[in-house]
């Protein structure tokens, strides 16, 4: 069975990885010829301000007194330049946002997982094409463009990473550092002839990355005074820098200024997903080559922002974030970034119609070059009779459009040129997408075949080894035939040869060949399949259809709960009514009432706000007090039992109570310290990490008696969970655990009611007994319900207090007891552990259910695996790459979550077994347990 689980784990890793090969592969191509506009540019230099984490509404709206938070930028909009909204794409993170701005290229979603400093951009950018680029700002952003550039013409000046502290006194210092260093740089340049000559060259870029707004947004939220004050500080800094540039270059009118943001931020201070507050960023441009403000009487937009911002009379020009890169390159006359997919927003340009037409033509040729390279690459690795070209953009059509565009330019029909080039760009982008997804159907079919095969094999294994379903059916053993293995070997050779002649990547061999051994294992059990069919036919059709419908309904409720959290409430409400629909109510009234009460109490959580809630430390304190009260009741009741406690066990419980008290103190004092802007106290940080480290060790010191061990696990994990909580979610594990304790009791009642085995006294059961294989029984129909309950509780543990399908559901304030200095992977790991704590509590309860119902962990675990895999297959079909970016990201993340859950089940099952069965001792004395 160990071999089966090892192979199962490997297969699930392949299925998990498949989504990245099918949907997350980078569309990058190399080998294009650089393209640039053959006319003199309007600007010699460009200054790019990126206010990290700045929302469009936060910049453009007026405050409660009717004044702008950024009066200088507002004045630019009304009197000097052009403005609009830059629409970003998912993931709304700093690296992808800057790549889109500076390279005109949308990285795939997996870019979020890349280390920023150690992973320079692998493609061309504005900085790379410039003669020189000087950049100031965050050490997380600047190095990736400098290291990715060819040559050494990109210079970076960044502060120490420790400055990025969410608990710092004043995050605006990150921005004032940038402004001060830029001023010092230009002051120094006057006395340095070499530097002076460089900054007086043409085709140069100055990049100012301003992180203060993002840091204040994470720490205090965008509605805070700190966030809004930071916008004013940035506005003042931009005003000073613009004045300095104009003075330094003698007001030569050859400087272009671009002010924008990489992404926005949600009301609760996070970003990463596709909410409008994250995807709508400001864009303000002025200076050389930029149109002056255009007064209009009416504008057509689907939103009501213009009226809210009182900018309805100034023409708003919206762009996609990647469009800013070709705008900047055309302004200073450098080649368009080779991998750019941005479309030049000609409405921003203040130049001749000829310049606009030539720039648009260059833009079209540059994107068409990518299409040609992509098509050639795909054609070279596909058999001629299997290759299907992109019909909308044939070679002849490309030639005709380009020829017609040149003819229009010659005859000075510039509007027609712009329109024709936009049409060509849209076709080329469609073609790029077509060839990028060319193999998607082949890969998808193989993954689905493998999935169905695996589910079939796991189901057959359950029926064959762990049930009585085919007992009594004919056991005639047939001599194995060599035809089946030979057939599969032949098919495998054909598939491998087909992939080899097409020069496919090695991963294609994995996806293409994996279904073969799986289906071979299924068809080897043909006798079991026959016996199963015979056995099923003996059951009444109505019973079979009823069970099938109930199972399907249960799966659909689980799937729908990923989209609508209130489905969890509906499911838990149905669970609450379950005892009254059976004989449980008559046999165990108190247990049934407890089950109903805690089911309904837990059902409240999915109805509460997912995110956007303000921190409420009083609820965290309340949860801590409830834990202490419960602990006092349990310890008191156990101490009353004769010989139930020895000193060591009492010491462990007191240690856990002390840990809970310390956690409450740390949460309160950390919150107070951060509000006073005094940062995270070192002692609090030490206590937090010590609590986290001890939470998986202290339970091993407690008694292995079932309820004592489970309660010890709850106390230890709750101490850590309190440190990671900011509001009502601190109550969630407590309510969930209470329901788990009742679940263990009620399952014993159902087992006795069904007459499968006699009821054991729970106070006499020790977790160490679960290694006794002689006590295990065969599976019955009711065990499918138990497995379904587990999956439902696991999904509830995931979605009970938030929608983790979305990156922006994470609140960074959750980790402030552990660290406040920006560290994406450490913070991510802590938040992942916060998600897994309820998961661990459910798995430990499941261990107890298996033990009390005398079931093999393997048999019940197999049913859980089948249910999870059916859900995963469901979500695989729901994955899409069309519609809004929020829909695309959500559909992919749902599949990733279910697959992760299935893989984590194996590891968490092992962790739960370790926590429940392992016993450590403080001293060498022999242990005694109460009966």
UniProtKB/Swiss-Prot annotation:
Membrane topology: Multi-pass membrane protein
Keywords per UniProt: Disease variant, Endoplasmic reticulum, Epilepsy, Glycoprotein, GPI-anchor biosynthesis, Membrane, Transferase, Transmembrane, Transmembrane helix
Cytoplasmic face residues: 1, 464-482, 530-543, 587-591, 640-649, 707-723, 808-824, 880-894
Enzyme Commission numbers on file: 2.-.-.-
GO cellular component, one term: endoplasmic reticulum membrane
Pfam families associated with the record: Phosphodiest, PigN
Pathway the protein contributes to: Glycolipid biosynthesis; glycosylphosphatidylinositol-anchor biosynthesis
InterPro entries found in the cross-reference section: Alkaline_phosphatase_core_sf, GPI_EtnP_transferase_1, GPI_EtnP_transferase_1_C, Phosphodiest/P_Trfase, PIGN_N
Gene Ontology molecular function, alphabetical: mannose-ethanolamine phosphotransferase activity
Superkingdom of source: Eukaryota
Subcellular location: Endoplasmic reticulum membrane
Chain coiled-coil ranges: none
Glycosylation site positions: 128, 192, 350
Family to which the UniProt record says this protein belongs: Belongs to the PIGG/PIGN/PIGO family. PIGN subfamily.
Disease listed for this protein: Multiple congenital anomalies-hypotonia-seizures syndrome 1: An autosomal recessive disorder characterized by neonatal hypotonia, lack of psychomotor development, seizures, dysmorphic features, and variable congenital anomalies involving the cardiac, urinary, and gastrointestinal systems. Most affected individuals die before 3 years of age.
Protein name as catalogued: GPI ethanolamine phosphate transferase 1
Source species: Homo sapiens
């Amino acid at each position: 069975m160990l071999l089966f689980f090892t192979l199962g784990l490997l297969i699930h890793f392949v299925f998990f990885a498949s989504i990245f090969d099918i949907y997350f592969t980078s569309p990058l191509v190399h080998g294009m010829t650089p393209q640039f506009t053959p006319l003199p540019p309007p600007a010699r230099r460009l200054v790019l301000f990126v206010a990290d984490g700045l929302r469009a509404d936060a910049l453009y709206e007026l405050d409660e007194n009717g004044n702008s938070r950024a009066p200088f930028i507002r004045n630019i909009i009304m009197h000097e330049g052009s403005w609009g909204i830059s629409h970003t794409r998912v993931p709304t993170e700093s690296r992808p946002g800057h790549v889109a701005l500076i390279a005109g290229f949308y990285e795939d979603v997996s870019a979020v997982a890349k280390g920023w400093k150690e992973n320079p951009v692998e493609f061309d950018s504005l900085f790379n094409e410039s003669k020189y680029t000087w950049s100031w700002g965050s050490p997380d952003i600047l190095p990736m463009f400098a290291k990715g550039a060819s040559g050494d013409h990109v210079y970076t000046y960044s502060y120490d990473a420790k400055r990025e502290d969410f608990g710092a006194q004043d995050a605006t210092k990150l921005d004032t550092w940038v402004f001060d260093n830029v001023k010092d740089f230009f002051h120094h340049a006057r006395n340095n002839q070499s530097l002076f000559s460089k900054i007086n060259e043409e085709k140069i870029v100055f990049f100012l990355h301003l992180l203060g707004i993002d840091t204040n947004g994470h720490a205090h939220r965008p509605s805070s005074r700190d966030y809004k004050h930071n916008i004013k500080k940035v506005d003042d800094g931009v005003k000073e820098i613009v004045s300095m540039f104009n003075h330094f270059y003698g007001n030569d009118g050859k400087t272009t200024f671009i002010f924008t943001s990489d992404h926005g931020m949600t009301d609760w201070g996070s970003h990463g997903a596709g909410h409008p507050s994250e995807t709508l960023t400001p864009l303000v441009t002025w200076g050389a080559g930029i149109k002056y403000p255009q007064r209009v009487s009416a504008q057509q937009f689907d939103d009501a922002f213009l009226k809210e911002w009182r900018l309805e009379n100034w023409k708003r020009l919206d762009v996609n974030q990647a469009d800013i890169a070709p705008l900047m390159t055309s302004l200073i006359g450098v080649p368009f970034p080779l991998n750019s997919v941005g479309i030049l927003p000609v409405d921003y340009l203040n130049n001749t119609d000829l310049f606009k037409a030539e720039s648009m033509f260059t833009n079209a040729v540059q994107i068409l070059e990518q299409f040609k390279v992509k098509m050639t690459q795909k054609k070279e690795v596909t058999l001629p009779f299997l290759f299907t070209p992109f019909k909308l953009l044939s070679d002849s059509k490309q030639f005709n459009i380009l020829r017609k565009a040149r003819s229009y330019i010659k005859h000075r029909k510039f509007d027609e040129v712009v329109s024709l080039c936009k049409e060509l760009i849209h076709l080329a982008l469609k073609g790029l997408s077509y060839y990028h997804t060319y193999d998607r159907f082949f890969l998808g079919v193989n993954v689905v075949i493998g999935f169905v095969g695996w589910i079939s094999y796991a189901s057959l294994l359950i029926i064959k080894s762990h049930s009585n379903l085919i007992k009594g059916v004919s056991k005639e053993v047939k001599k194995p035939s060599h035809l089946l293995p030979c057939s599969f070997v032949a098919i495998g050779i054909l598939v491998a040869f087909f992939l080899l002649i097409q020069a496919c990547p090695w991963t294609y061999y994995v996806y293409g060949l994996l279904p073969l051994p799986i289906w071979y294992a299924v068809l080897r059990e043909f006798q079991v399949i026959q016996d199963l069919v015979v056995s099923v036919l003996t059951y009444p059709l109505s019973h079979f259809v009823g069970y099938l419908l109930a199972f399907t309904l249960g799966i659909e409720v689980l799937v729908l709960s990923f989209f609508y959290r209130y489905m969890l409430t509906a499911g838990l409400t149905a669970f609450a009514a379950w005892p009254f629909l059976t004989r449980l109510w008559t046999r165990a009234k108190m247990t049934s009432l407890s089950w109903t009460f805690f089911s309904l109490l837990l059902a409240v959580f999915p109805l509460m706000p997912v995110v956007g809630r303000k921190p409420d430390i009083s609820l965290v304190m309340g949860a801590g007090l409830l834990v202490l009260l419960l602990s006092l009741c349990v310890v008191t009741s156990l101490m009353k039992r004769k010989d139930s406690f020895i000193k060591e066990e009492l010491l462990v419980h007191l240690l856990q109570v002390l840990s809970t008290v310390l956690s409450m103190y740390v949460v309160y004092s950390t919150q107070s310290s951060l509000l006073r802007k005094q940062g995270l106290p070192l002692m609090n940080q030490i206590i937090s990490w010590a609590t986290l480290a001890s939470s998986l060790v202290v339970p091993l010191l407690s008694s292995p008696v079932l309820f004592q061990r489970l309660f010890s696990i709850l106390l230890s994990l709750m101490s850590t969970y309190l440190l990671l909580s900011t509001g009502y979610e601190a109550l969630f594990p407590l309510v969930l655990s209470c329901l788990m304790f009742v679940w263990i009791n009620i399952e014993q009642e159902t087992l006795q009611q069904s007459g499968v085995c006699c009821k054991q006294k729970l106070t006499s059961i020790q977790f160490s007994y679960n290694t006794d294989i002689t006590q295990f029984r065969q599976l019955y129909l009711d065990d499918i319900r138990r497995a379904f309950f587990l999956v439902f509780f696991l999904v509830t543990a995931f979605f009970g207090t938030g929608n983790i399908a979305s990156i922006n559901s994470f609140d960074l304030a959750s980790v402030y007891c552990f660290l406040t200095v920006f560290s994406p992977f450490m913070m991510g790991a802590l938040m992942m552990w916060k998600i897994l704590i309820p998961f661990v509590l459910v798995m430990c309860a499941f261990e107890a259910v298996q033990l009390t119902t005398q079931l093999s962990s393997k048999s019940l675990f197999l049913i859980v695996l089948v249910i999870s895999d059916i859900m995963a297959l469901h979500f695989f079909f729901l994955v899409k790459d069309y519609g809004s970016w929020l829909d695309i990201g959500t559909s992919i993340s749902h599949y990733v979550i279910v697959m992760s859950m299935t893989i984590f089940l194996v590891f968490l099952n092992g962790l739960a077994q370790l926590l429940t069965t392992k016993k450590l001792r403080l001293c060498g004395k022999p242990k005694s347990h109460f009966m």
